[in-house]
């Protein structure tokens, strides 16, 4: 095992790193001299097992486990043992990483055992190809692949997914079609004269060679290679400016060609271990095209080795899933994690109500609806979450895909959030996480700009490779999805070189800044589509509205009337919308969800923490280090965005209160908060001058441009609000003391909750839950409820009132709702006379799971 290709490659990386430190090395199967040595061994070495046992650790078990330990007898000998070739890679690269980031060699060698065990089976990174202008240079660059894949292996990702065909949401209005329908850009298929007339044979062959180079490079490093084929349309609609087209294919030969093409591709690239398919209508194939997909699956099965089939969950129905399972190949379902965005590190308790109910067949409404008959009809709840796929008896794997709609450009890195995602990736026995990397969708839909992938106008800030800017984020996500409880040295060692004595401040600043936009995303979700909602460079949605509508905005999947105050949270079970919160205030019926004012308070706190940390970095000696300068700029922008959204949320609450009560003081507060928000956005725009004026993630104005472009709409909304302040009707209220209502509701009960979650439940039997309520406000508690639901996003939450005496409350969840088909999620709502809170909540760092999951007890079933 120690001589396997991945282990040998890793040993070469260690030798190279030692060589850069000026240390000469040699390799031998045995060595009896007294020089310092690293012994690399698999679990079958009895001598190594005996030595490890004497250090107090066992031989690693599992393909990806490893141990590093000093030899108990020979002080200059370090043992690296892996449970499999991949574990050996991680152990050896851990040594290399410690040496790279150390100032001296000796302290980099661990003097006490280091043990690694994976928490998730799949830790994947998805990189999109969606621009011939911006993506062909890295795709054709062997040096890029060598550096990038080495980084992924070092950070303990175990899968790389090259994603093709996601450049458009639908095959209409196509300009940049390079690798969109990928097969003819990569190979010829015997028996078919399918070709791209604008593509030379040499370039086609080069594309295939690079695909093989990348996939073989993954195998050499112990990485799985996943190929995403997201589009199977071959004729672009209304696309006169398409730079590449497909010839030689007809509807009757479409499915057979795709079958034979995917089989040929897998034969030509034997290191491809899995294929991802987008099944829903945006693939260019109408939903319910069962014969088409069963034919394509046969091509995967025909390649002669067990290649996995990964099915994107949106629009996936039982028959298509069954056809994939019938191949006998490993099948994975990959739902969206937080729609097409990034939220806090937990799975949304509930999806938006808009996507939950089953609808009538929409096929007759339009051509687009015909393509989307399942995801817009019988199974809309599969669009933006785990849907109904978390069945306890599932014969497939689940890997959650974290999309990049929230933050695409600015640097990101928060250890607590990354660790939270590492835990959430295993929800209810799920297999892991696929992370869409930063810069996802850059240059999409024909908007690529030569040499413009990183977006810097200040060229001194450009990294060597585009991913270099985000290396710290890769480190966090990779290592903390491998082990969410990893020690902090795993990431802190990488900061010392650039930040020196201010490394701790830099870590704290970016951690706080990195929680801002995910919180905005879940609390105020103007659109589930990344093609419309981009909070990083937000297209303003107005607070002020009139009888004849509002100012224009792109958020067509938000509730009507479409204004800022009516927008739904992405998790409406945990967060209150602005308008809903105002109704709760006026009705005196708070329900304990996180209010927009609480969100604003958190955003302000995170912004303040970001600024405090980055100011400590700034007061250090002036530096030309590009990483430090990039962090300073981006953290400052993120802090300003936090203050903008805090002000906007506060303004919206007070404006909705004014509209409901007529109170002038509420309107004045709304104006003041929106003015503060405008100033914060202006600050972000000024600090973002290091970026080019047109940052392109799509052709529409909402997907390109710069922060400064968004200011006029923000100022127009502020002016509309000031105009309202001048209206005579605004001077009179209805007598409601609005400020007192807000103050009472925001004084959440201060209680101590004690609860021991059950180890499981018996399907069909009542599940008794108990909770203790103590603390400062325990005497004011008017009641406790439990909110629960089987973990199927198509279902609504149920409420059960708890009975209590002397601070102890109990309730029985009815067995009729606990069938055992799904795990069950629940949380508690504690109420006083005019306020409420939820338990367990998101916690002080906003990174905890706000509900408890209980699964059926194995081997037990009620009558």
Language model: regions and residue ranges:
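Feature activates predominantly on carbohydrate-active enzymes
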Residues: 5, 10-13, 17, 60-253, ...
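Conserved, mostly hydrophobic/aromatic
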Residues: 18, 84, 152, 277, ...
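Catalytic-core regions of glycoside hydrolase
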Residues: 26, 102-103, 158, 170-181, ...
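Short, well-ordered secondary-structure micro-motifs within conserved domains or adaptor modules
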Residues: 26-57
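Aromatic-lined, polymer-binding surfaces characteristic
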Residues: 230-255, 268-273, 280-290, 629-646, ...
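C-terminal non-catalytic alpha-helical accessory regions
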Residues: 437-706, 710
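C-terminal non-catalytic interaction modules
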Residues: 693, 697-744
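Glycan-association/targeting regions that enable binding to alpha-glucans and other polysaccharides
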Residues: 722-863
